[in-house]
Amino acid sequence: MSDILQRLSECVEAGKANASSPFPAELKGQPGADELCQQALAAGVSPTDVLERGLVPGMARIGEKFNCGDAFVPEMLLSARAMTAAMKHLRPYFASGEVKRRGVFVCCTVQGDLHDIGKNIVAMVVEGAGFEVVDLGVDCRAEKILEAVEKHPGCAVGLSALLTTTMVNMEHIVREIRARHPQTLILVGGAPVTREFCEKIGANHYSPDPQGAVLYLKSAIAAA
């Protein structure tokens, strides 16, 4: 059992989504995260173990490499896609309640901004850490985010801005959320965003990388 979870974890870290994935070259033709997840479940490994001992460690390792400059956005995307390939087999267990979600994470790129790569990576990594992710897409207005917050009480919100010109919209959205749901956890990120800006607009946390967002969410929930 531990062997298949180790292999699954390694496939996520290496970005090996399935057997037909050409990368990495040394794993060409071998089962990827998709097949190994199915094999683990068929062998009787619990969905919780598949998530916590297979997917999460793999994403954590690639996240650490990203933080240290030993991996870059393309590698993160490949790993996130590998994790997503496995996650599709776990979603029915989340839906049935057999595997409990850590919480709900609502995310989007703010109004006026159509960039989504960073948001998508964060969404996939957070989902892989056991959260339900509600992805509202790009060019998202405050009203749409508020509707999601009201639909998912107690959720955390992640806002992304890749343009300096849309940072003002991020500030407006944070202000609107604070006015109606002051206890909501708000995370912000994106190329022009800084920790100082995060503090200035009243958000809870800034992280330059997906793994930092996951660590903050876990610690915030543990402290609640």
Please provide the spans of the model-predicted regions.
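Long amphipathic alpha-helical segments
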Residues: 1-95
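A charged, well-structured terminal subsegment
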Residues: 216-224
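Cofactor-cradling patches in redox/metallo enzymes
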Residues: 119-129, 134-203, 216
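Short alpha-helices
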Residues: 212
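Short acidic-hydrophobic, aromatic-tinged amphipathic segments that line or gate anion-handling sites
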Residues: 204-209
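Glycine/charge-rich, flexible interdomain linkers and switch-proximal surface loops
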Residues: 94-110
